Amino acid sequence: MAYEPMKPTKAGLEAPLEQIHKIRITLSSKNVKNLEKVCTDLVRGAKDKRLRVKGPVRMPTKVLKITTRKAPCGEGTNTWDRFELRVHKRVIDLFSSPDVVKQITSITIEPGVEVEVTIADS
């Protein structure tokens, strides 16, 4: 099998080596519509900058339940209220330098959406 020779580059014309990090953006919210809107905005912004993107990965929804008696006193029929809170979560992985991610995450984030950014060496 023959290998194609590498093209020599002129001295001083090499591409500047920029430190690439794996950046994990974790989004969580009670409102799915707002969460999906922020996800699409982030992914669209990253693809406009030509970054490598993985996600959004849908994590399992956490359902927090509280069951309580309706009657304030202990008398009467046992009737119960069941309340629940659903927390939805999305994870997006980006591969780029931190200052590019700072530009991408400067978008307007919908109310009620929690954003957590973690940077690691890839």
Swiss-Prot record:
Protein name: Small ribosomal subunit protein uS10y
GO biological process, one term: translation
Gene3D superfamilies named among the record's database cross-references: Ribosomal protein S10 domain
Record field: transmembrane: none
Keyword Ribonucleoprotein applies: yes
Gene designation: RPS20B
Annotated SUPFAM superfamilies: Ribosomal protein S10
Protein species of origin: Arabidopsis thaliana
Record PROSITE patterns: RIBOSOMAL_S10
Protein family (similarity comment): Belongs to the universal ribosomal protein uS10 family.
A Pfam family annotated for this UniProt entry: Ribosomal_S10
CC annotations in GO: cytosol; cytosolic ribosome; cytosolic small ribosomal subunit; nucleolus; plant-type cell wall; plasmodesma
Domain of life, per lineage: Eukaryota
Keywords: Ribonucleoprotein, Ribosomal protein
Coiled-coil blocks: none
A GO term for molecular function: structural constituent of ribosome
